[in-house]
Amino acid sequence: TVAVEKSMESMINLDGATLMFPTSFGYFDPHMLKEAVKFPAVQFSHCGGLWQEGENPKNTGSYFGYIDECQYLNGIAAGSTTKSGKLGFVAAKPIPQVLRNINAFTLGAKSVNPKITTQVIFTGDWAMPVKEAEATNSMIAQGIDVVTCHVDSPKVVIETAERAGIFTCGYHCNQSKLAPKGYLTGAEWNWEK
């Protein structure tokens, strides 16, 4: 939105910021890219953006944490727990960082049982609670007994799975309190270190 651009401009013009971290997925294009053109002396780094060398301004870039390594471990836990051999993954969009997480989760599970399958349902956006619940319920109806996700509102997936009595692996932060019976483990961010 225009408010995002105004906030960045305020940080640059009033506070003297020379390095910007606009972290929300939707901030990358067009907002960060527009501001980078306006302020070529400021470096813009976007968490998870779809930055491409040679196509985006030289003062822009992107970064992302290696949470797919944690998703691999989630997959091992899921693969060791499933009775059906069917796992589920509720995801927002088919972009590289999400696909890395899906692949890592599946490879982790297959390291325990090569016959395991992972069904993926994309909701289309980062926070779609109704679609996330529908996707989880659809997977449960198909006999999937462990689910995980890559969405901004994992609480919905975790709570839906817990109510249905299946297992979950969390994402973003510790959600074990949401699913005391079915929470196996989770891929959690720790930006402090």
Language-model segment annotations:
Residues 1-193:
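A residue-level marker of the well-folded mature domains of exported/periplasmic proteins
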